[in-house]
UniProtKB/Swiss-Prot annotation:
Gene for this chain: ku70
Gene3D superfamilies from the UniProt entry: 1.10.1600.10, 2.40.290.10, Ku70, bridge and pillars (4.10.970.10), SAP domain (1.10.720.30), von Willebrand factor, type A domain (3.40.50.410)
Subunit structure: Heterodimer of ku70 and ku80.
Protein name: ATP-dependent DNA helicase ku70
GO biological process terms on file: DNA recombination; double-strand break repair; double-strand break repair via nonhomologous end joining; positive regulation of DNA-templated transcription; telomere maintenance
Predominant subcellular localization, coarse grouping: nucleus
Catalytic activity, reaction form: ATP + H2O = ADP + phosphate + H(+)
Length: 909
């Protein structure tokens, strides 16, 4: 079984199957864990090899890893009558909210299977909640998302009327504070089954309420209920429960007004959420609402909290003088990009289909007693004696440097080149909660680095067990923009995108009337959107700033000295074609026409999407898998638009017939060059001592060097590299052990064509020591009046074979002697799919058979093989267009030899 150590948490955790792994630990009576030399190297590996593990250490024990927190989200959806009225886009707001809920549940199942999601409707006709409030229906408590919820929500969308689901809309107006109270109760009743920490599990969660509504002023005429709702929102904020508003417009003329009620309900825990530009935007389309939800769906979690040491470089933190002489700034490390992987499988019990819980027990090999973690020690044998280590000592040995960033100095920003980044960068942000004053000190450092144009060079150790890396900290200034300017820019961007779409549609349309209509529509849309732009007086009243880019530092991982390679300069001859400026301008025009607006969010991994679509179809018990769109494929429409321009450029660069002349000349040159190399290299006639002295031996291939050593009765190691083989040859010649009289046994790279005799051994000197293998053959006994001997078939040219042998047709090659002398007997040889003649020898046939033995026999055994042939393959023809007639290895496809010399001399199918 395969899986991970993180199991699904569900309600039936008590009935989960327990998978127990028993480790038998051998050793003396004190029960230590003994390592070999290989295992000793493994103990220095970190606890987590993914690079995102626990960042705690001795010097920073107070830091916690936020990745251990779970995300708990309650979808609080308004079910009033106004939510079921179609908007200007003919979309129902309630349906848009439910669709967003389905998408979020699907994403959570794929990416975060331990997060909790709850669903609550308010302003309903029925009630279902713990507090027994009217007009509140809890569809699902906070729990791990289940595919059954998706089926229930999809059934709700299929029904045109909400009342068919048994809920309906309430007649009057319910107190909004009761909905907030219900959410608070749902958070307090989170099931503890999936928690490993027990009582504190409810505190280590991100708690959020996603509120979907188009009513901007609930309980407008009841100040008491409004005050209760505001107080309830403050109580939720004190419990670290955050409310995220997803507002929707009722119509074009009835926009959602945030200032009427919800500006008192939303309490921002930090400045980051307050500066979010999507917090106050109302959506009318499902795509806009989904995009807004995507930004809020996943909580921004840091990889960990790390200190930035400035000052004394001494790692001894116990020295009070060293602590006083340095400044420590608390920072949080974030991943800006990460590679998307398929989720790991989870072990399940085949009987109950519940997650398997893994338990590991360490058992002493001598006493068979279960060992506690405190009874297990580590050791390494040195001088015949075990050297014992405790866990604390092992942690000290594995800790090379203190955790965090240690400032070494500064370098100009222009010295940090783009190719210095060897992996995706990370981002650090100050954290004032761990060490007060970190934000002030960090901002001062960033400001001075920006003024001086410097980058900080630091030694970075993410974990106590990891090796330190050299990194460069690149400062980034904060960018703020007023809300009015941001909204204007968004409208102008949407206007420009619509203009581009209309221009492209105009180019594709053929009639002039359609173009004029589209131009009129374009002018009307421009006038409408210009009217939607706020006036100067409205802009002056709205001075709220929106953060476009935060202040911080990018962590650039620097390479080591041997990681940088400089390519050799390649000399370019200037006697080629002269390119005119006109053709250069054409090439520039092609590049401009092929440019697209790149948005990384539009390009997803098609393999992952297909994988998740298959899982979703299985979980929801659907017959068909939803088709996924592959946006990585080339844009065929864009390519078709530039075909004429590309052809014009090609005609201007290449003369008529240039491409065909080059291709034919190249093929003829390459074939002639290959023939010269193949026929000209004769290892038996080479002056090996002179080649070693002049250094020309380095031009030979590894197979040539091995052939020479094998000729001199020297067997090199199978892992020997080319330099090792050259050293062996140099030592052989300089030591006087060179035997030139054996060079005549060396063969050329292209061996001569085989004779009539078929050799059954593989040309291996150790063939007698190999286990013999019987080859099955289909034999037919025929009577021969005269001598019958096996001979190789005549060579047939490739061109003739293409004409005479159509695909998928059997034919036989008859022996000259047997066709002339034998009576009714014929020797048939098969030509397989690659035009190789396959001889399957019977067990009694061997190379030692001579003509006298054959003449004395009245009957002879001939092998008949009948298979179909396919079209000849180009790579199987050698030597002036002749098909392959190399000798067949007696082991055929089951041959165990891997040396290249044997593979070149014999065929195996």
């Amino acid at each position: 079984m395969s899986g991970t150590n993180s199991w699904l948490n569900n309600n039936n955790n008590n009935s989960n199957t327990t998978l127990t792994n028993t480790n038998t630990i051998g050793g003396t009576n004190f029960g230590i864990n003994q390592f070999d030399g290989d295992d000793w190297d493994n103990i220095f590996d970190g606890n987590n090899g993914d690079g995102d593990g626990d960042l705690d250490g001795d010097s920073y024990k107070s830091y916690q890893n936020p990745y251990s927190y779970r995300d708990c989200i309650i979808f609080l959806i308004d079910a009033s009558k106004a939510m079921f009225e179609p908007n200007e886009n003919n979309e129902i707001p309630f349906h848009n909210a439910v669709k967003c809920l389905i998408q979020t549940i699907t994403d959570k199942i794929i990416t975060s299977d331990s997060d909790l999601i709850g669903v609550c409707f308010y302003n309903t006709n029925k009630k279902k909640n713990i507090n027994d409030f009217e007009n509140i229906y809890v569809l699902s408590d906070l729990d791990i998302p289940d595919p059954k919820i998706i089926l229930t929500l999809e059934e709700m969308l299929e029904n045109s009327n909400f009342t068919t689901n048994g809920l309906g809309n309430c007649q009057g107006e319910m107190p909004f504070c009761d909905a907030l109270w219900t959410c608070s109760t749902m958070f307090s009743n989170i099931k503890q089954s999936g928690s490993s920490s027990g009582e504190n599990s409810n505190n280590n969660n991100f708690k959020r309420i996603f509120l979907f509504t188009n009513e901007d002023n609930p309980n407008a005429y009841n100040d008491s209920i409004r005050n209760s709702s505001i107080q309830r929102s403050k109580d939720l904020s004190d419990l670290n429960i955050q409310i995220e508003l997803f507002s929707m417009n009722k119509s074009v003329n009835d926009k959602f007004d945030f200032s009427l009620f919800y500006q008192h309900i939303l309490i921002f825990a930090d400045e980051e959420n307050y500066l979010d530009p999507t917090q106050f935007d109302a959506s009318s389309k499902f795509s806009d609402l989904r995009f807004k939800l995507k930004r809020k769906e996943f909580k921004k979690r840091s990889l960990g909290k790390l200190p930035l040491y400035i000052g004394n470089l001494n790692n001894n933190n116990n020295n009070s003088n060293s602590l006083d002489s340095q400044v420590i700034i608390s920072t949080q490390l974030y991943n800006l990009f990460s590679h998307a992987h398929k989720s790991s499988p989870t072990l399940l019990d085949p009987k109950t289909n519940l997650p398997v819980k893994q338990l590991i027990k360490n058992v002493c090999a001598n006493t068979q007693a279960t060992l506690l973690p405190s009874q297990i020690k580590l050791c390494y044998h040195y001088g015949g004696e075990p050297v014992i280590f405790t866990k604390d000592e092992m942690q000290t040995i594995k800790s090379i440097d203190r955790i965090g960033f240690t400032l070494l100095g500064f370098k100009p920003l222009e010295n940090i080149k783009p190719y210095h980044s060897i992996k995706h960068s990370q981002f650090i942000f100050p954290d004032d909660q761990s060490i007060k004053g970190s934000v002030l000190a960090f901002n001062a450092l960033v400001e001075q680095m920006l003024k001086s144009g410097k980058a900080a060079i630091c030694r970075f150790t993410p974990r106590s067990s990891s090796s330190p890396r050299m990194v460069a900290l690149i400062p980034q200034e904060e960018i703020l923009q007023s809300e009015s300017e941001f909204n204007n820019q968004q409208l102008l961007n949407s206007l420009s995108s619509q203009q581009q779409q209309q221009q492209s549609s105009q180019q594709s349309s053929s009639s002039q009337q359609q173009q004029q209509q589209q131009q009129q529509q374009q002018q009307q849309q421009q006038q409408q959107q210009q009217q939607q732009l706020p006036s100067s007086s409205q802009q002056s009243n709205n001075n709220r700033k929106i953060q476009i880019r935060p202040r911080g530092m990018h962590v650039i991982y620097l390479p080591f000295a041997d990681d940088i390679r400089y390519p050799n300069n390649i000399g370019v001859k200037s006697d080629g074609l002269e390119i005119k400026q006109e053709n250069i301008d054409k090439a520039k025009n092609i590049i401009k026409m092929m440019k697209i607006k790149f948005d990384e969010k539009k390009f997803v991994n098609p393999g992952l999407q297909k994988h998740y679509a298959s899982l979703q179809a299985i979980a929801l018990e659907r017959d068909k898998v939803e088709e996924t769109v592959d946006n990585i494929q080339p844009d065929r429409k864009l390519i078709e638009k530039v075909i004429d321009t590309t052809q014009d450029f090609s005609d201007g660069i290449f003369p008529v017939g240039y491409a065909s002349t080059v291709s034919s000349a190249t093929s003829s040159t390459s074939s002639s060059s290959a023939k010269r190399l193949r026929d000209g290299k004769d290892l038996s006639t080479m002056d090996w001592p002179d080649m070693v002295k002049s250094g020309e031996i380095i031009k030979l291939t590894v197979d040539d060097l091995k052939s020479f050593l094998s000729n001199q009765n020297i067997k090199p190691s199978s892992k020997a590299k080319k330099a090792d083989l050259i050293d062996l040859i140099s030592n052989l010649i300089s030591g006087g052990n060179f035997k030139p009289d054996k060079l005549h046994l060396l063969k050329k790279d292209s061996p001569p064509l085989s004779d009539n005799t078929i050799t059954t051994n593989g040309g291996d000197d150790d063939d007698n020591n190999r286990p013999s293998k019987k080859v099955k053959s289909t034999s037919t006994s025929t009577t021969a009046s005269k001598n019958t001997s096996s001979s190789s078939p005549p060579l047939v040219s490739a061109a003739t074979m293409n004409k005479k042998a159509p695909p998928k047709k059997s034919f036989s090659v008859k022996d000259k002697n047997s066709s002339n002398n034998s009576s009714g007997g014929s020797s048939k040889a098969n030509v397989n799919d690659e035009f190789d003649i396959d001889f399957k020898n019977s067990d009694q046939d061997d190379d030692t058979d001579n003509e006298s033995d054959v003449n004395n026999k009245a009957t002879t055994s001939t092998t008949t093989i009948t298979t179909t042939t396919a079209a000849p393959k180009k790579n199987n023809f050698v030597n002036n267009g002749m098909f392959d007639t190399r000798e067949l290895c007696k082991y055929g496809k089951n041959c165990y030899r891997t040396n290249k010399q044997h593979l070149d001399e014999y065929r195996h199918q």
